[in-house]
């Protein structure tokens, strides 16, 4: 399976002891399911614009883990909606989720991220963070991170942040000779590079493709 895929809708199923890194790029509506077997590990990135995206992931046995990132861009012509549901059904499993969006003028974004931890589980970790980077005006944003925990011996956290290129940051960057557009580009680039740093085998060509899709 290729590291980077364009508009591939087939399910992802990791076998026992399999470790996999996948980047999905989508610009069309789609739905995808992911299954994790025992002792498997998935690092997964979704890059999207102008899309209606829905993912459901669930564990099929214990001792498996996933790290999932979403990178979205939205403006007046590219509304984005989506949902990510992660179901941890077995002990000694973990999910680390970060949903990051770049919102330009007249952006429309509706994202529901959720982690469900079943009853009677032990040593389970769940983390869900939604980060919305505001780069424009007149933005419509609906975000609802949800964490449902039905076990006691677990660690779990969730939250949502809204970040802007505030006036202090902007003044500092412009005092160094950068325009507002260049300052926004630096901010977006930092987030993208942070995510891509989790993918050890990504090529420079793939990096350039992702930066181009998400460029301000």
Predicted regions and their residues:
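Conserved beta-strand/loop scaffold segments within soluble protein domains that form the structured core
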Residues: 1-171, 175-178, 193-194, 200-208, ...
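Short, well-structured beta-strand/strand-turn elements
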Residues: 178-184
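Small/polar glycine-rich anion-binding or flexible loop at a beta-alpha turn
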Residues: 185-193
């Amino acid at each position: 399976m290729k590291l980077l895929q364009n508009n591939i809708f087939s399910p992802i199923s990791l076998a026992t002891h399999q470790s996999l890194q996948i980047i999905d790029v989508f610009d069309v509506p789609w739905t995808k399911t992911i299954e994790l077997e025992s002792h498997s590990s998935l690092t997964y990135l979704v890059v999207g614009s102008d899309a209606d995206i829905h993912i459901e992931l669930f564990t099929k046995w214990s001792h498996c883990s996933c790290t999932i990132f979403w990178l979205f861009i939205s403006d007046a012509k590219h509304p984005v909606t989506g949902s990510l549901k992660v179901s941890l059904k077995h002990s000694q499993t973990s999910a680390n989720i970060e949903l990051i969006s770049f919102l330009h003028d007249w952006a429309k974004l509706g994202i529901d991220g959720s982690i469900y931890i079943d009853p009677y589980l032990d040593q389970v970790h769940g983390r869900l963070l939604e980060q919305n980077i505001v780069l424009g005006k007149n933005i419509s944003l609906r975000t609802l991170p949800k964490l449902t925990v039905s076990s006691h011996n677990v660690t779990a956290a969730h939250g949502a942040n809204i970040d802007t290129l505030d006036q202090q940051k902007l003044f500092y960057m412009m005092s160094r000779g950068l325009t507002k557009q260049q300052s926004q580009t630096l901010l977006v680039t930092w987030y993208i590079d942070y995510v891509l740093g989790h993918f050890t085998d990504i090529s420079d060509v793939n990096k350039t493709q992702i930066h181009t899709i998400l460029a301000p």
